[in-house]
From Swiss-Prot:
A humoral factor that may play a role in stress tolerance. It comes from the Eukaryota. Induction: By a variety of stressful conditions including bacterial infection, heat shock and paraquat feeding. Residues 1-22 form the signal peptide. Pfam families: Turandot. It comes from Drosophila melanogaster (Fruit fly). The lineage of its organism: Eukaryota, Metazoa, Ecdysozoa, Arthropoda, Hexapoda. One of its GO terms (cellular component) is extracellular space. Its main location: secreted. This is Protein Turandot X. The keyword Transferase does not apply. InterPro entries: Turandot (IPR010825).
């Protein structure tokens, strides 16, 4: 009996590990990153649209926590923003989460500080990867 429980735990562990380790080379990673950049790094997208996509930004940050280099202070600010956002969304108004409006102040403060740095770092990392891939292709061509 003990052996089968141990085997079961190993199987569960092996099933969880691939999902817990983020593969930044996967197409879903690229799609998610491009989606976020198209929203948060685009000056033509209004704050309302950006605000609606905060859950996707948080999900990306939590799925790939080390992908974008942030200082410890920036990381702490991002974590504080996530906490504040979730706390705000947990408040129910007539049985439903807030539908917008007053959160704009928190969102604007976030965009003015660490959010802008996070998105810029994400964009710069993508640009560096393109340069690296382009140099690799040229090197192979020669």
């Amino acid at each position: 009996m003990g052996l089968s429980i141990g085997s079961l735990l190993i199987c569960v562990f092996l099933g969880i590990v691939p999902f817990a380790t983020a593969n930044t080379n996967s197409s879903s990673y690229e799609e998610h990153r491009n989606y976020l950049l198209n929203i948060f790094h685009n000056p033509f997208v209004n704050d309302s649209i950006k605000e609606k996509n905060i859950p996707q930004l948080i999900a990306f940050y939590q799925r790939y926590p080390t992908d974008v280099p942030l200082s410890d202070a920036d990381r702490q600010q991002f974590e504080r923003f996530i906490h504040d956002y979730r706390e705000y969304r947990a408040v129910l108004v007539d049985g439903a989460p807030p539908q917008g409006g007053s959160f704009g102040n928190i969102f604007g403060h976030f965009l003015g500080r660490v959010g802008t740095r996070y998105i810029s770092s994400l964009f710069n990392k993508k640009r560096e990867e393109r340069k690296s891939n382009h140099a690799y292709i040229i090197e192979d061509y020669n």
